[in-house]
Amino acid sequence: MQQLIAEITKSQLKTDLPSFRPGDTLRVHVKVVEGTRERIQIFEGVVIKRRGGGISETFTVRKVSYGVGVERTFPIHTPRIAKIEVLRRGKVRRAKLYYLRNLRGKAARIKEIR
């Protein structure tokens, strides 16, 4: 039984994913269905956490839109994600960047890896 589950999940895993970590700035292209139409919506922000493993792995991206912080959690291997672009590599010393929720403006900047 365990082997069957492992086989099924292996077939569902995406292989074209870029490597990214918390602190990186991503542009996530999400497929959105509105009625009968399907379009691509772009969500750009900083990865504040990655959790899980295998098919159930998720990541959370945070951005500030019109002065309001917006966080969105995506399953990594979902077919709803068309593609993920890594825009910047950030240098951080934590795996979970929850402290960014309390910072505003320039204080919330993350150093870039050259």
UniProtKB/Swiss-Prot annotation:
Record InterPro entries: Ribosomal_bL19 (IPR001857), Ribosomal_bL19_CS (IPR018257), Ribosomal_bL19_sf (IPR038657), Translation_prot_SH3-like_sf (IPR008991)
Gene name per UniProt: rplS
Function: This protein is located at the 30S-50S ribosomal subunit interface and may play a role in the structure and function of the aminoacyl-tRNA binding site.
GO cellular component: cytosolic large ribosomal subunit
Domain of life: Bacteria
Keyword annotations from UniProtKB, A to Z: Ribonucleoprotein, Ribosomal protein
GO biological process: translation
Family: Belongs to the bacterial ribosomal protein bL19 family.
An example Gene Ontology molecular-function term: structural constituent of ribosome
The organism of origin for this protein: Bacillus cytotoxicus (strain DSM 22905 / CIP 110041 / 391-98 / NVH 391-98)
HAMAP family, per database record: Ribosomal_bL19
PANTHER family in the record: LARGE RIBOSOMAL SUBUNIT PROTEIN BL19M, RIBOSOMAL PROTEIN L19
Protein's UniProt name: Large ribosomal subunit protein bL19
